């Protein structure tokens, strides 16, 4: 899997480098709406029986190096561990801005960084869990199979992104993005941890930090050419 990711990143860098050596006469600046799919979620849904998800994204280039974007999606995730079995399903939405970092403003290939805010509404079911009796050397642990249903949960977080998009065909782009996330607010019921937040990823008790990545395919619908 790591080798596959490295190959994708290398491919994108090579294409961006080639695109950046074009002269101003080789291409026109295109301003329009770019719509895309997260291929990572599609592949995970096909290969991981404990996961299902999809998302649609879109961005608009407002200035030479400034983009606004949004993403909407849904995820279902089953978490299995030695002490817990839980399932989560819900929807999410993100809004943010991206700033183009590469110097040649005319090339459609971009390296960018950005900042976004995310919101998710979801339900969580605790199907079974293990408790430990620290006061008894005879009973040790007990598995509880009484489900706990937690509905209408939500969370808000921020993301810092770094990524790249390269034009592989006319107006068709392949992209890769890394994300560093931090939960700033979330709703808990009965003081039970939200073990997975759709759109955010896995959570941990000790920190609100998280990480993620995506690789996307998108199509640019030009509105203005300069």
Regions inferred by a protein language model and the residue ranges of each:
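Outer-membrane beta-barrel "beta-signal"
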Residues: 98, 207-226
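Transmembrane beta-strands of outer-membrane beta-barrel pores
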Residues: 39-43, 72-78, 99-101, 117-123, ...
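Transmembrane beta-strands of outer-membrane beta-barrel proteins
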Residues: 33-37, 68-70, 93, 109-115, ...
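Short glycine/proline- and aromatic-enriched beta-strand/turn motifs that initiate or cap beta-hairpins
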Residues: 16-61, 71, 218-226
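Short loop/turn motifs that connect adjacent beta-strands in outer-membrane beta-barrel proteins
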Residues: 21-31, 65, 102-110, 168-174, ...
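Extracellular/periplasm-exposed beta-strand and loop segments of Gram-negative cell-envelope proteins
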Residues: 45, 73, 77-88, 122-133, ...
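Residues that define the transmembrane beta-barrel architecture of outer-membrane proteins
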Residues: 31, 50-54, 87-93, 109, ...
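Glycine- and aromatic-enriched membrane insertion/assembly motifs of diderm outer-membrane
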Residues: 46-101, 118-120
């Amino acid at each position: 899997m790591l080798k596959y990711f490295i190959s994708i990143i290398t491919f994108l860098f090579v294409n961006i480098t080639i695109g950046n050596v074009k002269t101003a006469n080789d291409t026109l600046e295109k301003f329009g709406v770019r719509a895309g799919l997260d291929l990572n979620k599609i592949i995970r849904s096909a290969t991981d029986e404990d996961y299902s998800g999809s998302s649609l994204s879109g961005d608009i280039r407002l200035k030479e190096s400034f983009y606004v974007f949004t993403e909407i999606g849904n995820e279902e995730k089953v978490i299995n561990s030695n002490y817990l079995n839980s399932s989560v399903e819900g929807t999410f939405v993100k809004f943010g801005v991206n700033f183009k970092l590469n110097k040649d403003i005319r090339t459609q290939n971009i390296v960018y960084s950005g900042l976004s805010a995310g919101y998710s509404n979801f339900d969580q079911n605790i199907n079974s869990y293990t408790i430990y009796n620290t006061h008894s050397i005879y009973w040790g642990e007990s598995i509880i199979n009484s489900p706990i249903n937690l509905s209408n949960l939500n969370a808000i977080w921020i993301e810092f992104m770094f990524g790249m998009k390269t034009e592989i065909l006319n107006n068709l782009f392949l992209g890769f993005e890394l994300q560093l996330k931090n939960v700033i607010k979330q709703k808990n019921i009965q003081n039970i941890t939200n073990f997975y937040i759709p759109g955010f990823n896995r959570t941990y008790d000790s920190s609100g930090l998280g990480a993620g990545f995506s690789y996307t395919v998108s199509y640019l619908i030009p509105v203005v050419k300069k």
